[in-house]
Amino acid sequence: NTYYAVLSLKSYYPDLIQIFAEESYSKGIDNVAEGLKVLSEEFGFNPRIEYTILGDNDFVTAAEKMIELIKRLKEQEFRIAIDITPGRKPLVSAALIPAMKLRLDHVFYLAVKELLPMPYMMIPLAQQQLRDFMEEAMKVKK
């Protein structure tokens, strides 16, 4: 649902989608990739979709892989966004370190009042709010 919200509310259309998943949660990753592909096509573009499977709770490897990917993409002048909504804590934590250190463009999170197993547009907008923590971080007083 976060991806749909980002596409529709932010008009953010990535060239590359990189999915990170832990081994225990990787069984449906092909379905996730297919869903992202279908949504992207509905919005008129076709990003490359790749994924990386990591060991469960392997924070160090996750952080290293994410930092390596982000540095490589920044060298190629990509704008970089991450979605932390569905992530498990070790992966989210590993993603937030480079987000701040390497100054990512967006850290998206879909805040929902109640988890509902429904598509984004079927859930009342009052029940969900797309947040961009990088935008919000700029408002933090130092």
Segment roles from a protein language model:
Residues 1-79, 90-142:
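Long, low-complexity, Lys/Arg-enriched
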Residues 87:
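Conserved TIR/SEFIR loop-to-helix hotspot centered on a Trp-containing motif
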Residues 82:
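Conformationally flexible catalytic loops at phosphate/diphosphate-handling active centers
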